[in-house]
A protein has these predicted regions:
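Active-site metal-binding motif and surrounding structural segment of the metallo-beta-lactamase
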Residues: 121-122, 132-182
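Metallo-beta-lactamase
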Residues: 98, 122-124, 130-132, 184, 190-266, 310-315, ...
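N-terminal pre-domain segments of enzymes
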Residues: 5-93
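Bacterial N-terminal signal peptides
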Residues: 1-2
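Conserved beta-strand hairpin/beta-sheet module of binuclear metal-dependent hydrolase folds
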Residues: 89-149, 274-278, 282-288
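Solvent-exposed loop/turn segments at secondary-structure junctions
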Residues: 110-113, 130-133, 158-163, 189-191, ...
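Short, solvent-exposed loop/turn and secondary-structure capping segments
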Residues: 117-118, 135-138, 166-167, 183, ...
Length: 317
């Protein structure tokens, strides 16, 4: 019907919406730009080709250019909550970054951030994106500046697909089975990865479309992304079974000459999760338990409810 067609189109904000959004400009300190300075620290290079990634058939599996309407120099539209707009602006700061000595990150090649930690002989990859294609592109960008270092280790910090799905973009089954590359994950990782992404994956995927507004057009009257990131890539999701499971807090493991000290965090942002500390680099990774977002204790897509008491304890232990 004509009415249904009209209802499907974005509408201008009501006066009430404008007033509520404008009120946030007074309630929060938007003059503080420290987060923007922090997010740009160590910047090396922008994502090549606008960040667009294609598969072997030439199909686009990742296209961040659809979110170019968001920029750090652009004012918040009156259709958008200013706090959400600010978060989206921070997410638009993508590329290759050097976060500290021997640690690099590629941001903006998927929902998650992929990290590269340089060992004695090669590089250890932490959380290799959703798809093999985006992880491969991130590794290529890192190697452009750091050289063709072999991947000597992969760490899955937790059991969500955006932290392991691209593993075959950074290593091979042969390198893993031969011992050239170790894959480390928290105890219970495989069971939880399968239960959420395979057994419940179809139902959760459908609910995610409502939760994230995946089918809504990108734009200030549509969707700005998924909050934690923009969206997920649509490439090849892969999984290589971990060769080493971490079972208890305080467990230490040396990977490519670097000692890792692990802290278990099951039942936090994911059912199977851990944090780790690298004493030699004075570097701490808290997976997705200390992000600049509201802690996602419950997701509308139907992931397992997280234990807020445990989560808080892991961050203060």
């Amino acid at each position: 019907s004509v009415l249904a067609q009209d209802d499907s189109k974005p509408k201008p904000p009501t006066e009430a919406t404008k007033q509520v959004n404008a009120a946030w400009l007074e309630r929060l300190d938007f003059a503080n730009k420290q987060d923007f300075a922090d997010a740009q620290q160590g910047f090396i290079e922008a994502l090549p080709g606008g960040g667009v990634v294609k598969n072997d058939k030439g199909d686009i599996v990742w296209d961040p250019t659809k979110f170019r309407f968001i920029g750090v120099d652009k004012d918040c539209p009156d259709t958008v909550n200013p706090s959400l707009w600010r978060m989206s602006q921070l997410l638009s700061l993508t590329g290759l970054f050097k976060t500290s000595d021997r640690i690099f990150q590629v941001r903006g090649y998927d929902l998650s951030v992929i990290t590269f930690i340089e060992g004695e002989k090669g590089v250890i990859v932490v959380d290799p994106c959703v798809s093999a294609e985006t992880a491969k592109a991130a590794l290529a960008l890192y190697r452009k500046h750091a050289g063709d270092k072999p991947v000597t280790g992969v760490i899955y910090t937790h059991s969500h697909v955006d932290h392991f799905g691209g593993v075959r973009g950074v290593t091979t089954d042969e390198d893993v089975s031969s011992g050239k590359c170790v894959i480390v994950a928290p105890e219970g990782f495989t069971e939880e990865a399968v239960s959420e992404n395979v057994m419940a994956g179809n139902a959760m995927g459908r609910r995610a479309s409502y939760m994230y507004g995946n089918v809504i057009p990108r734009g200030p009257q549509g969707t700005l992304g998924a909050g934690l990131g923009t969206t997920t890539s649509s490439g090849t999701v892969t999984l290589i079974e971990p060769t080493k499971f971490i079972e208890k807090t305080g467990e230490k493991l040396t990977i490519d000459g670097l000692e890792f000290d692990f802290l278990m965090a099951p039942g936090s942002e994911a059912p199977a999760e851990f944090h780790f500390y690298i004493p030699a680099l004075k570097a701490l990774c808290t997976a997705e338990n200390a992000c600049h977002t509201l802690h996602n204790f419950y997701t509308l897509r139907g992931a397992k409810t997280r234990d807020s008491k445990k989560w808080a304890a892991y961050l203060t232990q």
